[in-house]
Amino acid sequence: MAFRDKSQCPMYMGETGENTDEWIESFRKALDEVNIGWTFWTYKRLDAQRSFVSVPMPEGWQKICDFLAADRSEYALIREVRPDQSEMRRILDVYLENCKFANCRPNDGYVAALGLNP
């Protein structure tokens, strides 16, 4: 902060790690006290508490994650681990439906920790 004051440059905290609502509130207040701007990420996350709202995880989502984590360095390997496409489309369609705000779960504790009205 001495550098900030000496050089007349604003400080900004662009992103922090995931923590508890209590930690987030404490850190946010500390930043506010010393006039450091901040951003907490993200607005929506899949089945998580550390975001403004949580997107419900669709049944079968792990199949997509497993495919993405599999060795796909050769076409033969891709074909070997490739999941059923109609099932993947169904899972992704459910995911897109779940992303609609009306289907998300608000994380009131997270919002309150940021000093906002949930």
Model-derived features: positions:
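Substrate-binding cleft of secreted/luminal carbohydrate-active enzymes
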Residues: 3-117
